[in-house]
Amino acid sequence: MASLNKLQSALGVRFTNPAVLEQALTHASFTNENPAGKAGDNERMEFLGDALLNLFVAEQLYRDFPDLPEGKLTEIRVSLIRQDTLAEKALLLKLGDYLLLGRGEDASGGRVKRNNLADAYEALTAAIYLDRGFETARSFVLAGFATDIHDIKEGKHSPNFKAMLQELTQANFKALPEYEIVESTGPDHDRIFCVSVSLGDVLLAVGSGKTRKAAESEAARAAYGKLSADSHSG
């Protein structure tokens, strides 16, 4: 594992207790192979970090977009705090170089696995909060998302509903959504596509658009909204 001093310099955060930072970078595979070690793995920190990320980003969106309704704010927040997004931010910090992994996980490419990187970013957020407090953690998160939020203000950011739906169905149902063209109508130069999205045998939603990609995105948006509403009401 690379020097934690180097990581702290990159973060702009100096830990009073470096053991907290080390735990945030400790994968469960490492603790399984080293049960006598003092530090636990980072799974509980992931839980806390996820909540903190959602809080800090939601608060900033609330302040920056006073005219947007709750549903739209939720869409933007979810589109920002996704596994792929968090993994990209972890890559920028080179978190993979600092992970403590079991031998098997390391050999199988664990340092570049997107789920490991995203989990480590969540855990790192929690570690900063636990060691340095609320404001330092908030500053770290908002600095990391500053460009993303700026792009939203400039109209350069569009939620990737297909990716959001895939993450949701994988997490909750261990299955991938499937898209199918239901029909296409109109002349070749002005065709409208209608696409369905299903999970197994269950039809989730239907969307339409001038291209298949646009229709799939609209179907994914509708399906994501439906599943999110169902999970909140249930």
Regions inferred by a protein language model and the residue ranges of each:
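Double-stranded RNA-binding/processing signature
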Residues: 1-234
